[in-house]
């Protein structure tokens, strides 16, 4: 199942577990007698580990095309399908990400972080403000613990 979500993007709020628990307790307490022995299970994988993982990929090329800067990485959708926006999302949004080898640097340029596959779907971040990155730098994509 879909499980419980995590706050991936600005404005997302964490699941209110006490509220969910109270609602479930109310529903379970009112089950018909035929369902009294029913076991209810929840899939909690994303909720438990989603924020715990960081996907790292290395910049292998830096190029500018028609005034747009692209950081080409050795990873991408073939490693991190969810962050590429190709995992059942209707609207693609950037996962939280950073230039891991330049954490202390100020975000100074807008870049598109892309994977190495020959498809326009292989994108990890669009129009993201990042410190200037060079070939060899590491890109970190956060909230990568699930999928």
Regions found by a protein language model. Give the residues of each.
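Charged (often Lys/Glu-rich) extended helix/loop segments that serve as interaction or gating elements
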Residues: 37-147
């Amino acid at each position: 199942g879909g499980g419980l979500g995590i706050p991936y993007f600005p404005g997302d709020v964490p699941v209110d577990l006490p509220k969910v628990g109270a609602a479930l307790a109310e529903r379970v307490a009112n089950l018909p007698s035929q369902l009294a022995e029913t076991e209810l299970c929840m899939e909690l994988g994303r909720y438990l580990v989603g924020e715990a993982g960081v996907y790292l990929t290395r910049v292998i090329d830096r190029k500018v095309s028609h005034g747009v800067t692209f950081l080409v990485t050795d990873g991408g959708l073939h490693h991190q399908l969810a962050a590429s926006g190709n995992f059942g999302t209707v609207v693609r949004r950037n996962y939280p990400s950073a230039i891991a080898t330049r954490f202390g640097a100020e975000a100074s340029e807008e870049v598109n972080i892309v994977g190495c596959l020959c498809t326009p779907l292989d994108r990890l971040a669009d129009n993201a403000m990042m410190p200037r990155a060079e070939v060899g730098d590491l890109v970190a994509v956060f909230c990568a613990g699930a999928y």
